[in-house]
Amino acid sequence: MIKFDNKLEIRYSFNDKSAYMDAWIKHRCEKEILSMLRVLADLLDVKMTAHCEPFSQEGGYRVVWPIAGESTRSISVVLNILMQVLTRPTLSVGGQPLVDRTNSDEENMQKEISLLKRSLKLKQAGALIPRELVELLASWPKFCKYKSNFYEALRGYPKVTKINVRELNENNRSRSGSLEVKREQFDYFILRSDDLPTIKDNKATIEIISPVLKDSRYRWKGIYNKGGETIDFYMCDEDFKKQMFDEKISFTSGMCIDCVLEIARKLSELGETINISYTVTTVIRTRFDKLEIVTPQGKRHLRKLEAEKKQLTLDLFG
């Protein structure tokens, strides 16, 4: 007999007194929440399985998922993070992201996850869920997409007026406060676009496989040093292309460029980040074997970076 010390409850409130719900909407919503639950459990290395429990209710619709696993406390932590992330808006009133995600946010999130995971493994009593971790997870693109899919499905189903989530114990008594999101707030969770901010790699190195000098519509091919993957990229450094066309720089097999690389990204339906295009804006230097040549535009770029660094130092200590 499986013991269920933890349960997750989702209540859908309706604009009428019925107790039925569109099956397609219900299953689409459940898919997004279960996906978030699985990702959180994997991130924190918590072994758990979710089950379905029948529950009757007059007016509205109630879903209860009994959760089984090795640690009641760890499961409770996962459920509480899930509830906070699910009910924390992604966008402002104007439709802009509440948080501008940066690379340091990704690093901090992984650091906070590691600390909480360690705390759970050591079974430290009274370990709190860091607020910073909840905020970082709530703005994580993967979870933003899950939330967007969830609330977009409900927005298209006018019958639902609000949702509530809470954790229950084995006797279906509340283990946590109930968190609520009303219909008029749904838009604050729905992404306006799947496009993500372009990231800039100022220290990219690409081994050129095949250049294209005559037609800017075609992409170059090279091996990107981050992960060693082969990429197709646009060369938008016109000075560099002219230098190669005029044979001031000659292409040789094995030639590498250190450059500024812009990477355009978007979210997939599953919340995965996909790189959709690569663009080299500035070639800083060329390298072949032990020979390195800094380009004129590369010198200008390096001087600009140095000036910005000095200005930042003055601002900090001035």
Question: Which residue ranges define each predicted feature?
Answer:
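Extended, charge-rich, solvent-exposed interface segments
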Residues: 288-318
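Structural detector for short beta-strands of small beta-barrel domains
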Residues: 199-216, 220
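OB-fold/S1-family single-stranded nucleic acid-binding modules
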Residues: 264-299
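Short, acidic/hydrophobic/Gly-rich beta-strand patch recurrent on exposed beta strands
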Residues: 221-226
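Beta-strand/loop nucleic-acid-binding surfaces
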Residues: 228-250
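Flexible glycine-rich surface loops and low-complexity tracts that mediate binding to linear polymers
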Residues: 206, 249-273
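Beta-strand elements of well-folded, non-transmembrane domains
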Residues: 14-16, 210-212, 261-267
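Charged, alpha-helical interface segments at or near domain boundaries
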Residues: 1-201, 211
